[in-house]
Curated annotation (Swiss-Prot):
This is Protein Mx1. CDD domains: DLP_1. The gene is Mx1. SMART domains: DYNc, GED. GO terms for molecular function: GTP binding; GTPase activity.
Length: 397
């Protein structure tokens, strides 16, 4: 635990000033002249971007049908010490709105979007900045971009899809940008427009992170919302499974980090990596000798010390290169395994066990009073219309 706390302190001391500097430069508009490092959050319309950002920030962002994010939203999260009070601020153009409670965020952002893009369904490339300072958020800055839509609806401009894609592309095509692509788990990932755009500007996937947003609770609410008892019980079970799966995945990831502390000196892969590094180092030394022969001759007077230091450096490089490669492969695989496979299987098994309890089936399927009344009304209407049809049929005869 002490090592984790030391790492966090080191991060806050070294990384936080860099994030603050980038945020300051972006606020000054330097991004028009220079590409600044950024994490851009993209996704198809209603892909679950808001849920991801709300989980990180702890505040409610604008939601609804259609295009909700109509301006790029720079979400600046700053971690405070335990006991310090939550603070927030929304900035756009020359306007700054101080916030004292998380519940004020949604309305403030909506006002900012209406001010910049107008009241309606248009979009703008002007930034809205949301600063959130809290003990419960990470030190992080994200840029939330409008959700991708294919077809204009209602009063939307006919070329709204093209406008959004053009806006997104201005961010994700920069080499300094990491693209966080949010994909709902209940669709074919290969067909998502956001992922296609990310692959187009980053074919190797070096700057792209895919985040699969589970939709179990959403599907439950949409399809079984009338059965309140079933919904409440199922949501409780889903939350319990999610927490257990998170704990199991975390333990497995920690185990992989512990395993990487072991140096496999006899491992063929490690030996190959070490060989490659040695060849590169030798090539560098040859180049240095050609450029500056005098320096090379002076260094050769201390062969033993130089060789020992060089060997240690080469082993360290080989070890960390293999660690990075192994962790880069295994950690995403573990996360995908738990999200896409075991989580769904556990929910399916739990729901089947739930419905096998015959003593509670009638309680689970008990409808809300307004649903029962609606059904009675529809039945009476159906009877009236059926009688009217029969009378009309007799009249025509």
């Amino acid at each position: 635990m002490d090592s984790v706390n030391n790492l966090c302190r080191h991060y806050e001391e070294k990384v936080r000033p860099c994030i603050d500097l980038i945020d300051t430069l972006r606020a000054l508009g330097v991004e028009q002249d220079l590409a600044l490092p950024a994490i851009a959050v993209i996704g198809d319309q209603s892909s679950g971007k808001s849920s991801v950002l709300e989980a990180l920030s702890g505040v409610a962002l604008p939601r609804g049908s259609g295009i909700v994010t109509r301006c790029p939203l720079v979400l600046k999260l700053r971690k405070l010490k335990e006991g310090e009070e939550w603070r927030g601020k929304v900035s756009y153009d020359d306007i700054e709105v101080e916030l004292s409670d998380p519940s004020e965020v949604e309305e403030a952002i909506n006002k900012g979007q209406n001010f910049i893009a107008g009241v309606g369904l248009g979009i703008s490339d002007k930034l809205i900045s949301l600063d959130v300072s809290s003990p419960n958020v990470p030190d992080l800055t994200l840029i939330d971009l409008p959700g991708i839509t294919r077809v204009a609806v209602g009063n939307q401009p006919a070329d709204i899809g093209r406008q959004i894609k053009r806006l997104i592309k201005t961010y994700i095509q920069k080499q300094e940008t990491i693209n966080l692509v949010v994909v709902p788990s209940n669709v074919d990932i290969a067909t998502t427009e956001a992922l296609s755009m990310a692959q187009e500007v980053d074919p190797e996937g070096d700057r792209t992170i895919e985040m699969v947003q589970t939709a179990f609770v959403k599907i439950l609410s949409n399809d079984f919302g009338d059965f309140l008892n079933l919904c409440c019980t199922a949501k409780s079970k889903i939350k319990e499974i999610r927490l257990n799966q998170e704990k199991e995945a975390e333990n497995l990831i920690r185990l992989h980090f512990q395993m990487e502390q072991i140096v496999y000196c006899q491992d063929q892969v490690y030996k190959e990596t070490l060989k490659t590094i040695r060849e590169k180092e030798a090539e560098k030394e040859k180049t240095k000798a050609l450029i500056n022969p005098a320096t090379f001759q002076n260094n050769s007077q201390f062969p033993q010390k130089g060789l020992t230091t060089t060997e240690m450096t080469q082993h360290l490089k080989a070890y960390y290169q293999e660690c990075r490669r192994n962790i880069g492969r295994q950690i995403p695989l573990i996360i995908q395994y738990f999200i896409l496979k075991t989580f769904g299987e556990e929910i399916e098994k739990t729901m089947l066990q739930l419905l096998q309890d015959t003593s509670k089936c009638s309680w689970f399927l008990e409808e809300q009073s307004d649903t029962r009344e609606k059904k009675k009304f529809l039945k009476r209407r159906l009877l009236r219309l059926d009688e009217a049809r029969q009378k009309l049929a007799k009249f025509s005869d």
